[in-house]
């Protein structure tokens, strides 16, 4: 009587290993894409909050735009939103957020551009309503 050895062949094991590897790669690529989309949405939310803080609160009260923005002069905006997802404060080197005032006299500006660099899309830009 001969004993028959049961188990998987090398080909079967290799096939399963390749399949698991491909599934892992697909998972991590998809995970990265979701993280990038979430980060881009966070940036858009921050820029929109700053924009509406300037347009709906600051400008009606002062009739001008500030030369720089921070939680000191835009109290209606969550202070955490002035820091990009990488932890860099707006208008500092390496920040994903830029506030560019224009037509300024004595720190009182007539217009501005708010911008955020996005990874999956074109830059997100908001300009002042009152030019």
Label each PLM-derived region with a short phrase.
Residues 2-31:
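N-terminal single-pass transmembrane signal-anchor helix
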Residues 17-18, 26-48:
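Aliphatic-rich helix starts adjacent to a transmembrane/signal segment
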Residues 54-86, 124, 128-131:
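Short, glycine/small-hydrophobic-rich surface segments
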Residues 104-131:
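Short, surface-exposed interaction loops/tails
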